[in-house]
Amino acid sequence: ILIEPDKNEYIRLKKKYKKFNDIKVFKDGIAEKDTNMTLNIFENPAMSSSLNRKNISPLFWGERKSQIRIKKKVYIKCKSLDNFILSNKLQVDFLKLDVEGLETKILESSNKIFKTMLGIRSEVSFADIFGKNKNDPGSFVDLHKKMIENNFTLLNLDYDGKGDYFSEYLISNSRYGVLQNTDAVWIKNLSFIFRLNDEVKLFKIVSFLILNNAYDLAIFILNKSSSKFKKYKSLDKTNLYNFVKISILKHLYKLKWIPGQKISNHKKIFEKIFGEKYLSMNEYNENVEINPY
Protein backbone atom coordinates (compact mmCIF):
# COMPACT_ATOMS: atom_id res chain seq x y z
CA ILE A 1 0.00 0.00 0.00
CA LEU A 2 1.45 3.37 -1.06
CA ILE A 3 -0.11 6.66 0.08
CA GLU A 4 0.74 9.89 -1.76
CA PRO A 5 -1.18 13.21 -1.53
CA ASP A 6 0.72 15.06 -4.28
CA LYS A 7 -1.16 14.57 -7.55
CA ASN A 8 1.95 14.45 -9.75
CA GLU A 9 3.71 11.94 -7.50
CA TYR A 10 0.53 9.88 -7.27
CA ILE A 11 0.33 9.67 -11.08
CA ARG A 12 4.01 8.75 -11.30
CA LEU A 13 3.61 5.95 -8.75
CA LYS A 14 0.46 4.62 -10.42
CA LYS A 15 2.33 4.40 -13.71
CA LYS A 16 5.40 2.84 -12.10
CA TYR A 17 3.47 0.03 -10.40
CA LYS A 18 0.64 -0.51 -12.90
CA LYS A 19 1.86 -4.03 -13.72
CA PHE A 20 1.90 -5.10 -10.06
CA ASN A 21 -1.51 -6.40 -8.98
CA ASP A 22 -0.45 -6.61 -5.34
CA ILE A 23 0.54 -2.93 -5.08
CA LYS A 24 -2.12 -0.27 -4.57
CA VAL A 25 -1.53 3.48 -4.64
CA PHE A 26 -3.91 5.84 -2.79
CA LYS A 27 -4.18 9.57 -3.37
CA ASP A 28 -4.61 10.55 0.26
CA GLY A 29 -2.86 12.57 2.88
CA ILE A 30 -2.25 11.16 6.36
CA ALA A 31 -2.44 13.47 9.37
CA GLU A 32 -3.27 13.32 13.07
CA LYS A 33 -6.99 13.63 12.25
CA ASP A 34 -9.38 13.89 9.31
CA THR A 35 -8.82 17.39 7.98
CA ASN A 36 -7.87 19.58 5.02
CA MET A 37 -4.29 20.81 4.86
CA THR A 38 -2.00 22.93 2.72
CA LEU A 39 0.90 20.97 1.24
CA ASN A 40 4.01 22.96 0.32
CA ILE A 41 5.46 21.48 -2.87
CA PHE A 42 9.21 22.08 -2.87
CA GLU A 43 11.51 22.27 -5.88
CA ASN A 44 12.69 18.88 -4.62
CA PRO A 45 9.30 17.09 -4.35
CA ALA A 46 10.69 14.48 -1.94
CA MET A 47 11.00 17.21 0.71
CA SER A 48 7.46 18.58 0.34
CA SER A 49 5.71 19.14 3.67
CA SER A 50 2.71 20.78 5.29
CA LEU A 51 5.11 22.30 7.83
CA ASN A 52 7.58 25.15 7.50
CA ARG A 53 11.04 23.71 7.07
CA LYS A 54 13.99 25.46 8.71
CA ASN A 55 17.12 25.73 6.61
CA ILE A 56 19.50 24.44 9.27
CA SER A 57 21.28 21.78 7.22
CA PRO A 58 24.55 22.84 5.53
CA LEU A 59 23.68 20.41 2.74
CA PHE A 60 21.15 22.98 1.52
CA TRP A 61 23.12 26.18 1.99
CA GLY A 62 24.98 26.16 -1.31
CA GLU A 63 23.94 25.09 -4.77
CA ARG A 64 21.20 22.86 -3.32
CA LYS A 65 19.49 25.81 -1.62
CA SER A 66 16.88 26.00 -4.38
CA GLN A 67 15.69 22.45 -3.54
CA ILE A 68 13.90 23.64 -0.41
CA ARG A 69 12.22 26.58 -2.10
CA ILE A 70 8.43 26.30 -2.19
CA LYS A 71 7.30 25.95 -5.80
CA LYS A 72 3.56 25.91 -5.14
CA LYS A 73 0.94 25.18 -2.51
CA VAL A 74 -1.83 22.62 -2.95
CA TYR A 75 -4.79 21.78 -0.74
CA ILE A 76 -5.21 18.14 0.20
CA LYS A 77 -7.70 16.00 2.08
CA CYS A 78 -6.20 14.02 4.92
CA LYS A 79 -7.31 11.12 7.05
CA SER A 80 -5.99 9.89 10.35
CA LEU A 81 -3.98 6.69 10.04
CA ASP A 82 -6.59 4.75 12.02
CA ASN A 83 -9.44 5.98 9.82
CA PHE A 84 -7.52 5.24 6.63
CA ILE A 85 -6.95 1.67 7.84
CA LEU A 86 -10.60 1.30 8.88
CA SER A 87 -12.10 2.72 5.67
CA ASN A 88 -9.93 0.49 3.48
CA LYS A 89 -10.35 -2.61 5.69
CA LEU A 90 -6.62 -3.12 6.11
CA GLN A 91 -4.59 -5.16 8.56
CA VAL A 92 -1.17 -3.55 8.70
CA ASP A 93 1.88 -5.65 9.55
CA PHE A 94 4.55 -3.08 8.69
CA LEU A 95 4.61 0.68 8.28
CA LYS A 96 7.02 3.04 6.52
CA LEU A 97 6.57 6.68 7.53
CA ASP A 98 8.22 9.57 5.71
CA VAL A 99 5.92 12.56 6.07
CA GLU A 100 8.44 15.36 6.58
CA GLY A 101 7.82 16.28 10.20
CA LEU A 102 4.35 14.85 10.90
CA GLU A 103 5.53 11.40 12.00
CA THR A 104 5.09 12.08 15.72
CA LYS A 105 1.59 13.58 15.49
CA ILE A 106 0.39 10.80 13.19
CA LEU A 107 1.54 7.99 15.47
CA GLU A 108 0.52 9.70 18.70
CA SER A 109 -3.07 9.83 17.41
CA SER A 110 -3.02 6.23 16.16
CA ASN A 111 -4.15 3.29 18.26
CA LYS A 112 -5.68 0.66 15.97
CA ILE A 113 -2.50 0.15 13.96
CA PHE A 114 -0.57 -0.94 17.05
CA LYS A 115 -2.91 -3.91 17.47
CA THR A 116 -1.50 -5.59 14.34
CA MET A 117 1.77 -3.84 13.52
CA LEU A 118 4.94 -5.93 13.81
CA GLY A 119 7.57 -3.47 12.63
CA ILE A 120 7.99 0.13 11.56
CA ARG A 121 10.53 2.24 9.70
CA SER A 122 10.21 5.99 10.12
CA GLU A 123 12.19 9.09 9.34
CA VAL A 124 13.31 10.72 12.60
CA SER A 125 14.99 14.00 13.38
CA PHE A 126 17.44 14.98 16.11
CA ALA A 127 17.28 18.72 15.45
CA ASP A 128 14.61 21.42 15.21
CA ILE A 129 14.06 21.01 11.46
CA PHE A 130 10.33 21.62 11.80
CA GLY A 131 10.28 22.93 15.38
CA LYS A 132 8.92 26.24 16.59
CA ASN A 133 11.68 26.97 19.06
CA LYS A 134 15.43 26.52 19.27
CA ASN A 135 15.15 23.90 22.03
CA ASP A 136 13.03 21.48 19.98
CA PRO A 137 14.76 18.06 20.32
CA GLY A 138 13.42 16.68 17.04
CA SER A 139 10.99 13.81 16.55
CA PHE A 140 13.04 10.83 17.73
CA VAL A 141 12.46 11.27 21.47
CA ASP A 142 8.65 11.28 21.27
CA LEU A 143 8.49 8.58 18.59
CA HIS A 144 10.73 6.26 20.59
CA LYS A 145 8.62 6.82 23.70
CA LYS A 146 5.46 5.93 21.75
CA MET A 147 7.07 2.76 20.41
CA ILE A 148 8.30 1.65 23.85
CA GLU A 149 4.79 2.17 25.26
CA ASN A 150 3.50 -0.24 22.61
CA ASN A 151 6.09 -2.97 23.27
CA PHE A 152 8.48 -2.18 20.44
CA THR A 153 12.27 -2.31 20.53
CA LEU A 154 14.59 -0.01 18.59
CA LEU A 155 16.33 -2.23 16.06
CA ASN A 156 18.70 0.19 14.38
CA LEU A 157 19.29 3.57 12.77
CA ASP A 158 20.41 4.08 9.19
CA TYR A 159 23.00 6.56 10.48
CA ASP A 160 26.55 5.34 9.80
CA GLY A 161 28.53 8.21 11.30
CA LYS A 162 28.28 10.36 8.18
CA GLY A 163 26.14 13.35 9.05
CA ASP A 164 25.38 16.71 7.45
CA TYR A 165 28.87 18.10 6.83
CA PHE A 166 29.91 21.73 7.22
CA SER A 167 33.03 21.82 5.05
CA GLU A 168 34.92 19.70 2.54
CA TYR A 169 37.81 19.18 4.96
CA LEU A 170 36.92 15.65 5.97
CA ILE A 171 37.96 12.06 5.45
CA SER A 172 35.22 10.40 3.42
CA ASN A 173 35.59 6.94 4.98
CA SER A 174 35.54 8.30 8.55
CA ARG A 175 32.91 9.91 10.76
CA TYR A 176 31.97 13.52 10.08
CA GLY A 177 29.23 16.12 10.28
CA VAL A 178 26.18 16.43 12.52
CA LEU A 179 23.35 13.92 12.82
CA GLN A 180 20.17 15.85 12.03
CA ASN A 181 17.90 13.16 10.64
CA THR A 182 17.89 9.54 9.54
CA ASP A 183 15.57 6.53 9.45
CA ALA A 184 14.88 4.50 12.60
CA VAL A 185 13.57 0.94 12.68
CA TRP A 186 11.57 -0.72 15.48
CA ILE A 187 10.21 -4.25 15.88
CA LYS A 188 7.99 -5.89 18.46
CA ASN A 189 10.06 -6.89 21.48
CA LEU A 190 11.39 -10.43 21.86
CA SER A 191 8.98 -11.42 24.63
CA PHE A 192 6.09 -10.74 22.23
CA ILE A 193 7.78 -12.58 19.38
CA PHE A 194 8.47 -15.71 21.42
CA ARG A 195 4.85 -15.81 22.62
CA LEU A 196 3.58 -15.95 19.05
CA ASN A 197 1.67 -19.06 18.04
CA ASP A 198 1.43 -17.88 14.45
CA GLU A 199 4.44 -18.93 12.37
CA VAL A 200 3.35 -16.75 9.44
CA LYS A 201 3.69 -13.68 11.66
CA LEU A 202 7.02 -14.99 12.91
CA PHE A 203 8.30 -15.34 9.35
CA LYS A 204 7.01 -11.87 8.48
CA ILE A 205 9.05 -10.47 11.36
CA VAL A 206 12.10 -12.45 10.27
CA SER A 207 11.69 -11.15 6.70
CA PHE A 208 11.52 -7.60 8.04
CA LEU A 209 14.71 -8.20 10.02
CA ILE A 210 16.49 -9.55 6.95
CA LEU A 211 15.44 -6.53 4.89
CA ASN A 212 16.72 -4.23 7.64
CA ASN A 213 20.19 -5.78 8.04
CA ALA A 214 19.50 -7.76 11.21
CA TYR A 215 20.48 -11.28 10.15
CA ASP A 216 21.90 -12.07 13.59
CA LEU A 217 18.54 -11.47 15.27
CA ALA A 218 16.65 -13.23 12.46
CA ILE A 219 18.76 -16.37 12.92
CA PHE A 220 18.43 -16.16 16.71
CA ILE A 221 14.62 -16.05 16.48
CA LEU A 222 14.44 -18.83 13.88
CA ASN A 223 16.71 -21.05 15.96
CA LYS A 224 14.80 -20.48 19.21
CA SER A 225 11.44 -21.13 17.55
CA SER A 226 12.36 -24.01 15.23
CA SER A 227 11.30 -26.82 17.57
CA LYS A 228 8.07 -25.04 18.56
CA PHE A 229 6.99 -24.82 14.92
CA LYS A 230 8.44 -28.21 13.84
CA LYS A 231 11.06 -26.68 11.57
CA TYR A 232 8.36 -24.62 9.84
CA LYS A 233 7.26 -27.50 7.59
CA SER A 234 3.74 -26.11 7.24
CA LEU A 235 5.25 -23.12 5.42
CA ASP A 236 7.85 -24.83 3.23
CA LYS A 237 5.82 -24.44 0.01
CA THR A 238 5.25 -20.71 0.46
CA ASN A 239 7.09 -17.75 -1.05
CA LEU A 240 7.58 -16.34 2.46
CA TYR A 241 9.41 -19.46 3.64
CA ASN A 242 11.50 -19.61 0.48
CA PHE A 243 12.55 -15.97 0.78
CA VAL A 244 13.71 -16.48 4.37
CA LYS A 245 15.47 -19.77 3.68
CA ILE A 246 17.36 -18.53 0.61
CA SER A 247 18.28 -15.24 2.31
CA ILE A 248 19.72 -17.05 5.34
CA LEU A 249 21.58 -19.50 3.10
CA LYS A 250 23.16 -16.66 1.10
CA HIS A 251 24.11 -14.83 4.29
CA LEU A 252 25.80 -17.87 5.79
CA TYR A 253 27.63 -18.56 2.54
CA LYS A 254 29.13 -15.04 2.62
CA LEU A 255 30.33 -15.57 6.19
CA LYS A 256 32.68 -18.40 5.22
CA TRP A 257 35.33 -15.92 4.07
CA ILE A 258 35.39 -14.05 7.38
CA PRO A 259 38.19 -15.01 9.82
CA GLY A 260 36.94 -17.08 12.75
CA GLN A 261 33.85 -18.36 10.95
CA LYS A 262 33.36 -22.13 10.59
CA ILE A 263 31.43 -23.70 7.73
CA SER A 264 30.56 -26.59 10.05
CA ASN A 265 28.73 -24.15 12.35
CA HIS A 266 26.87 -22.63 9.39
CA LYS A 267 25.77 -26.10 8.31
CA LYS A 268 24.68 -27.01 11.82
CA ILE A 269 22.55 -23.92 12.45
CA PHE A 270 20.92 -24.00 8.98
CA GLU A 271 19.95 -27.66 9.21
CA LYS A 272 18.71 -27.23 12.78
CA ILE A 273 16.42 -24.37 11.75
CA PHE A 274 15.05 -25.66 8.46
CA GLY A 275 15.63 -29.42 8.60
CA GLU A 276 17.07 -29.24 5.08
CA LYS A 277 20.51 -29.95 3.68
CA TYR A 278 22.96 -27.04 3.82
CA LEU A 279 24.30 -26.33 0.34
CA SER A 280 27.97 -25.52 -0.14
CA MET A 281 30.54 -25.32 -2.93
CA ASN A 282 29.18 -26.51 -6.31
CA GLU A 283 25.78 -27.46 -4.85
CA TYR A 284 25.33 -23.86 -3.78
CA ASN A 285 26.65 -22.32 -7.00
CA GLU A 286 24.56 -24.59 -9.25
CA ASN A 287 21.28 -24.17 -7.36
CA VAL A 288 18.78 -22.34 -9.60
CA GLU A 289 16.94 -20.75 -6.65
CA ILE A 290 20.16 -19.12 -5.47
CA ASN A 291 21.66 -18.39 -8.89
CA PRO A 292 18.79 -18.31 -11.41
CA TYR A 293 20.85 -16.80 -14.24
Where are the model-predicted features located?
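Phosphate/nucleotide-binding beta-alpha loop and adjacent structural elements of enzyme active sites
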Residues: 1-293
